[in-house]
């Protein structure tokens, strides 16, 4: 097995090498050359049996930054290696994941967590969330979704989510996939405006601290076993 990497700038999936910066392994069939031009903004990959199976792109485009003109509705999911379009009409999709045989994806420009039928391409909205959705980790029946405050720039302006919510949040939403309800949200009030990815790390206890603990005047929180507690 090898480490597969989504190479957005070169519009391909690649692996690493001691002799080269990277080795291109796959590119969408509409991308005619490996070039540092971000032609379709290939940004996410879902693995099946240790190999890439689905990828998200922001447009079926073959020119430098060509996806930008259709970012609100030009996104799609492609099958690997065929480049078959599984579903289209998405708004800046990110973070495809396979979980229990279901293809999940974030329809970021609409702030949605959705599922996609890999055979029919049918999209089903699980929940709309108050943020630009990017970064998805699923553990059991819970989905952890990254939320970002979009910037009013040429890239993020004029997206459907701007009309859907008056105010966007930055943080991590926890969604119960059975009830389709957001049961919790860790919101960053300051210091952080964007979440780029999420990973769930099982059986670990990390130190918890704000992004600027010294500035905030708070002490870090440490997790220790009960046996380490002082005995009075």
What are these regions (language model features)?
Residues 1-2, 31-53, 74, 85-102, ...:
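Beta-rich, blade/repeat-based domains predominating
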Residues 2-5, 52-56, 102-105, 143-145, ...:
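Conserved beta-propeller blade signature
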Residues 8-10, 58-60, 108, 148-150, ...:
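Short loop/turn segments immediately following the C-termini of beta-strands
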Residues 16-20, 70-81, 159-179:
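Beta-propeller blade signature
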Residues 23-35, 82-88, 121-127, 183-187:
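A short beta-strand motif characteristic of beta-propeller blades
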Residues 55-72, 146-167, 217-223, 229:
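Short, conserved, GDST-rich strand-edge loop motifs in beta-rich repeat architectures
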Residues 90-177:
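Loop/turn-rich, solvent-exposed surfaces of beta-rich toroidal or solenoidal domains
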Residues 168-171, 177-232:
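Blade-level signature of beta-propeller repeat domains, shared across WD40, Kelch, NHL, RCC1
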């Amino acid at each position: 097995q090898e480490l597969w990497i989504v190479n957005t700038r070169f519009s391909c999936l690649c692996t690493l090498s001691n002799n080269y910066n990277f080795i291109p392994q796959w590119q969408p069939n509409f991308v005619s050359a490996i070039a540092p031009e971000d032609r379709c903004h290939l940004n996410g990959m879902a693995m099946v049996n240790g190999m890439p199976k689905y990828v998200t792109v922001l447009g079926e485009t073959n020119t430098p930054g060509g996806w930008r003109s259709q970012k609100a509705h030009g996104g799609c999911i492609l099958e690997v290696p065929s480049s078959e379009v599984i579903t289209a009409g998405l708004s800046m999709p990110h973070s495809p994941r396979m979980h229990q045989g279901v293809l999940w994806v974030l329809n970021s420009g609409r702030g949605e967590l959705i599922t996609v039928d890999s055979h029919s391409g049918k999209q089903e909205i699980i929940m709309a969330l108050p943020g630009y959705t990017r970064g998805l980790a699923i553990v059991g029946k819970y989905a952890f979704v990254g939320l970002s405050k979009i910037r009013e720039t040429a890239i993020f302006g004029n997206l459907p989510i701007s009309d859907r919510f008056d105010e966007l949040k930055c943080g991590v939403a926890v969604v119960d996939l059975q009830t389709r309800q957001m049961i919790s949200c860790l919101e960053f009030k300051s210091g952080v405006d964007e979440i780029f990815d999420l990973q769930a790390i099982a059986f670990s206890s990390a130190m918890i601290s704000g992004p600027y603990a010294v500035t905030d005047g708070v002490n870090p929180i440490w997790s220790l076993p009960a046996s380490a507690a002082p005995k009075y």
